C-alpha cells in the first residue's frame, strides 16, 4: 500500500470522524467570538497590535489543544477499530501510515491557520479601522504563519505519544496541554531568559515569531525546533515498526 492510497483512505475516514468536525468547528468559532467580545461586550485594547497579540494567545491556546485532540483521535481510532492490524502485517505500509497521519494532520492545521489569519485581519479592520493598513496586514500574516507552522513542528512528538499509548486517550491529551502551556509561556520571555528560551523548542516559537531578537538566537531556536520535529517523526516510525499485531 503506497502513501497515495493511504492518504486517499485517510480522507475518506474523515467523513465519519466526529472529533475532527468538533475540533474544526470550535477552532473556527474562537477567533469570531474574540472579535464579538471586543466589539460588543467589552472595550478592546487601545492599540491594534495589542489586540492581535491577545488574539494570537487565545486562538493558539484553543487551536493547539484541539490539534492535539485531533491527532490523538486520528491514531487512537485505528487501534480501537482494529483496522491497524492490516497496517501492522505489512512492513512497507507502516512508514506510510505515519506519514499519512502527519499529512492529514498538517492539512487540517494549515487550512485552519489560514482561516484564523483571515478572521484576525478582518477583525482588526472592523475594530481598528484607523490603524489598518497593508503593512499591518503583512505583519499579522507573517507573525501568525511563523507561529503556527513552527508550533506544528514542535507538536510532532505528540504523534509518537499517540502510537505508544495505543487505545488510551488521556496521556497524549495531557502532553498536548503541557506543550501548549510551554508554547504560550513563551509570550512572557524576559531578556535574561532569551538564550534558555531559544534552547527549548516550544518557547523558541514565540522568540522567533513575535520577539525581535538577534540572529544567533533565531538560528539556535530554528535548529532545536527542527530537531524536535525530526526526532518526533523518527520515534513515531520506530515505535510503529516495533509494534506487533
Listing of model-derived features with the role each one plays in the protein:
Residues 18-40, 55-70, 171-186, 227-230:
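Hydrophobic alpha-helical transmembrane segments of multi-pass membrane transport/permease proteins
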Residues 64-71, 84, 157-158, 201, ...:
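Hydrophobic/aromatic residues in alpha-helical transmembrane segments
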Residues 1-24:
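Aromatic- and glycine-rich beta-strand/loop motifs that create alpha-glucan
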Residues 73-106:
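Helix-loop-helix units of permease transmembrane domains in multi-pass membrane transporters
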Residues 31-67, 99-165, 169, 206-217:
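Secretory targeting signals
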Residues 26-35, 113-117, 121, 222-235:
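Hydrophobic core of alpha-helical transmembrane segments in multi-pass integral membrane proteins
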Residues 37-50, 172-245:
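Terminal transmembrane helical anchor/hairpin motif
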Amino acid at each position: 500500500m503506497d502513501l497515495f492510497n493511504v492518504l486517499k483512505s485517510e480522507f475518506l475516514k474523515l467523513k465519519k470522524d466526529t472529533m475532527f468536525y468538533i475540533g474544526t468547528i470550535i477552532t473556527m468559532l474562537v477567533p469570531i467570538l474574540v472579535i464579538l467580545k471586543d466589539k460588543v461586550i467589552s472595550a478592546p485594547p487601545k492599540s491594534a497590535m495589542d489586540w492581535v497579540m491577545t488574539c494570537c494567545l487565545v486562538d493558539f491556546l484553543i487551536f493547539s489543544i484541539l490539534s492535539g485532540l485531533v491527532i490523538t483521535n486520528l491514531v487512537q481510532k485505528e487501534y480501537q477499530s482494529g483496522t491497524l492490524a492490516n497496517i501492522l502485517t505489512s512492513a512497507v505500509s507502516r512508514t506510510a501510515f505515519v506519514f499519512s497521519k502527519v499529512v492529514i494532520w498538517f492539512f487540517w492545521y494549515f487550512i485552519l491557520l489560514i482561516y484564523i489569519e483571515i478572521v484576525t485581519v478582518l477583525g482588526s479592520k472592523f475594530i481598528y479601522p484607523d490603524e489598518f493598513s497593508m503593512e499591518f496586514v503583512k505583519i499579522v500574516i507573517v507573525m501568525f504563519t511563523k507561529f503556527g507552522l513552527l508550533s506544528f513542528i514542535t507538536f510532532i512528538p505528540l504523534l509518537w505519544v499517540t502510537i505508544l499509548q495505543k487505545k488510551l486517550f488521556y496521556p497524549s491529551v495531557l502532553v498536548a496541554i503541557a506543550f501548549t502551556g510551554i508554547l504560550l509561556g513563551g509570550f512572557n520571555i524576559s531578556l535574561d531568559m532569551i538564550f534558555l528560551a531559544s534552547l527549548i523548542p516550544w518557547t523558541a516559537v514565540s522568540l522567533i515569531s513575535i520577539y525581535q531578537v538577534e540572529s544567533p538566537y533565531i538560528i539556535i531556536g530554528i535548529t532545536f525546533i527542527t530537531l524536535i520535529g525530526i526526532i518526533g517523526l523518527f520515534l513515531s516510525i520506530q515505535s510503529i515498526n516495533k509494534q506487533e499485531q
